[in-house]
Amino acid sequence: MVKVGDKIKIIYMEGEPQYSGKTGIVELIDDIGQIHGTWGGCALIPNVDKFEIVEE
């Protein structure tokens, strides 16, 4: 399960192909579970978008 502070890599974001391959840090998980972070203006939607936690 992803949490605030995790580094993630976006594999696929529905309707936003330019985000594929971007990495960023999770800054906020909102009340409906969307994941916001440093990769740009769009939130990730669990069970729709694909991403992985990057282990450092």
Where are the language model's segments positioned?
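Basic/aromatic-rich interaction segments and small domains that mediate binding to polyanionic partners
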Residues: 3-56
